[in-house]
Amino acid sequence: MSRPQFDPSAYAAQLEDKKSRLAGLLAPFAAPAPEIFESPREHYRLRAEFRLWRETGNEKRHYAMFEQGDKHTPILIEDFPIASRRINELMPRLKAAWADPALGFKLFQVEFLTTLAGDALITLCYHRPIDDAWRQAAEKLAAELGVNLVGRSRGKRIVVGRDYVEEELSVAGRRFRYRQPEGAFTQPNGEVNQKMLGWAYEALGQRDDDLLELYCGNGNFTLPLATRVRKVLATEISKSSVNAALANLADNAVDNVSLVRLSAEELTQALNEVRPFRRLADIDLKSYAFGNVFVDPPRAGMDPDTCELTRRFERILYISCNPETLAQNIAQLHDTHRISRCALFDQFPYTHHMESGVLLERR
């Protein structure tokens, strides 16, 4: 990852710029003014990734990051104020552990994953095979730091403790527990994610029909939204995310969700009866009374066929990490659906990136 520019004094102006940019992109569709959900100014990022950089002429190593497009000029990191307090507390303690050759030899990358609930997992990546000597040293370190550890080298992965962290998020007075796996996507800004879940929960409202969810990930939105509808059909293509979502549904006793490992494009084919899928053999698609669809697509947005699929629903709840592709998708749907609510979630302070949400309702 590249190092964001950290300047809390500039936060308000940067957020205003994002608000203006989103409002401008949605203006052709007569969107209401966006609701704004701010981020904490510091210690908001729950994960961080650092390369290790060795000083020329000695063995001293540092956490390092690079400006985008420049992989040769390191920015040496002693602390990282945008990262969670837990990450900042762990950084020097982990650095001291590099003195043990069993842990430090040919270590080239470190990844931290933490939660608002206080859990932490550290992944150590090596340019050498790791073995039982590494495991023994890692078990001691994990106990000292109170973390889970994962070691990675070519073709090998050793887990000390758990290979996931445990998160708790509160939505509308109910607490939901999440397993967030190492290496899988999770929302980086926990406080803003919690606000985003609350907005989506409120925007959907209480319904007596069913919800289709595309790109469900580890069930981040699935859990609270499932309490708003009769039942949910959710899709996700990543195997690790599917497994995490199934565990999260079970841990929270959410029993009205069916989850299938299909891409959005494949589900479109299934709903249009273009072709059958074995993974849908136990699911009766005709038993669903879909009135709502929730989408949280990748940066490329929805492909035209998937976008066309969403047109058949009364309500389209759309979370986007790219406002440009969001606007492109809305342009395709604008003749049948209007924007009734929109929001800006500042997941990524001090960068140009933004998360946004819209509720589209049939005209």
Curated annotation (Swiss-Prot):
InterPro entries per record: MeTrfase_TrmA_AS, MeTrfase_TrmA_CS, SAM-dependent_MTases_sf, TrmA_MeTrfase, U5_MeTrfase_fam
CDD domains for the chain: AdoMet_MTases
Name of the protein this chain belongs to: tRNA/tmRNA (uracil-C(5))-methyltransferase
A biological process from GO: tRNA methylation
Signal peptide interval: none
Organism of derivation: Pseudomonas aeruginosa (strain UCBPP-PA14)
One Gene Ontology term, aspect cellular component: cytosol
PROSITE patterns: SAM_MT_RNA_M5U (PS51687), TRMA_1 (PS01230), TRMA_2 (PS01231)
E.C. code: 2.1.1.-, 2.1.1.35
Organism domain of life: Bacteria
Reaction(s) the record says it catalyses: uridine(54) in tRNA + S-adenosyl-L-methionine = 5-methyluridine(54) in tRNA + S-adenosyl-L-homocysteine + H(+); uridine(341) in tmRNA + S-adenosyl-L-methionine = 5-methyluridine(341) in tmRNA + S-adenosyl-L-homocysteine + H(+)
Gene3D superfamilies the UniProt entry points to: 2.40.50.1070, Vaccinia Virus protein VP39
Binding site residues for S-adenosyl-L-methionine: 187, 215, 220, 236, 296
Gene that encodes the chain: trmA
Family, per entry: Belongs to the class I-like SAM-binding methyltransferase superfamily. RNA M5U methyltransferase family. TrmA subfamily.
Active site residues of this protein: 321, 355
UniProtKB keywords: Methyltransferase, S-adenosyl-L-methionine, Transferase, tRNA processing
Function: Dual-specificity methyltransferase that catalyzes the formation of 5-methyluridine at position 54 (m5U54) in all tRNAs, and that of position 341 (m5U341) in tmRNA (transfer-mRNA).
MF term (GO), any: rRNA binding
